[in-house]
């Protein structure tokens, strides 16, 4: 992304806009990942209308997509179905706003490194996000570490998806700092 992002405070947009201008930041919206918002189109429109009062160009901005309980790699078809719905809802909001991209989380079970699970995680995420990238060519799709204990699994997905032009990884350094790996290891492995 090579861009500094600021999460705007919807209650104090004047200050958020001022900070963004002062530091050359784009916005990363964190208002649209909650199930209550995703289930309420009226609430979505209210949030969008509020942001549009303060900004007309969203082309450098991103948003956090749905991530609470989202498990696209689940062996349970019904969980995958709801997870796919939430991800598609996120992409539609991004498309409506004209955002640069959407950040999703890996959704992995922290510390669970059984081979079949990691293989399934990579294969199912690659298939799903490859298809999603084709459907939404105007938006970037980023996969961010969250409770991942090391960068290798996310790096494996990035390698698998390297030919997909609108897919990439997003390193959350604060999440990475909670692991036993150094920041350097995260950066070098994901680079």
State what each model feature region is.
Residues 1-3, 14-21, 92, 154-168, ...:
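Histidine-acidic metal/acid-base catalytic patches
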Residues 1-70, 74-89:
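N-terminal pre-domain/capping segments
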Residues 3-5, 24-28, 58-62, 100-103, ...:
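Structural preference for beta-strand elements that scaffold enzyme active sites
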Residues 10-12, 31-33, 67-69, 106-110, ...:
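Active-site-proximal loop/turn and secondary-structure-junction residues that shape catalytic pockets
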Residues 20-22, 55, 134-136, 190-191:
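Flexible, charged surface loops at secondary-structure boundaries
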Residues 35-40, 144-151, 174-184:
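Active-site glycine- and acidic-residue-rich loops that bind
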Residues 43-58, 124-132, 185-189:
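Catalytic-core regions built around general acid/base machinery
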Residues 73-168:
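Active-site acidic/histidine proton-transfer and metal-coordination neighborhood
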């Amino acid at each position: 992304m090579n861009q500094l992002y600021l999460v705007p405070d919807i209650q104090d947009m004047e200050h958020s806009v001022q900070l963004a201008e002062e530091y050359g930041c784009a916005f990363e919206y964190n208002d649209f990942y909650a199930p209550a918002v995703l289930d309420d189109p009226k609430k979505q429109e209210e949030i969008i209308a509020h942001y549009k009062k303060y900004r007309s160009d969203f082309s450098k901005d991103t948003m956090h997509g749905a991530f609470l309980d989202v498990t696209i790699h689940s062996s349970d078809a019904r969980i995958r179905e709801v997870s796919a719905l939430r991800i598609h809802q996120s992409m539609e909001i991004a498309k409506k706003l004209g955002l640069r991209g959407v950040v999703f989380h890996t959704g992995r079970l922290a510390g669970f490194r059984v081979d079949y699970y990691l293989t399934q995680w990579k294969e199912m995420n690659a298939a799903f996000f490859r298809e999603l990238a084709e459907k939404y060519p105007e938006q970037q799709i980023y996969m961010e570490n969250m409770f991942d204990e090391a960068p290798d699994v996310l790096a494996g997905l990035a390698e698998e998806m390297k030919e997909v032009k609108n897919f990439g990884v997003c390193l959350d350094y604060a999440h990475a700092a909670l692991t036993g790996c150094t920041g350097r290891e995260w950066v070098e492995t994901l680079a």
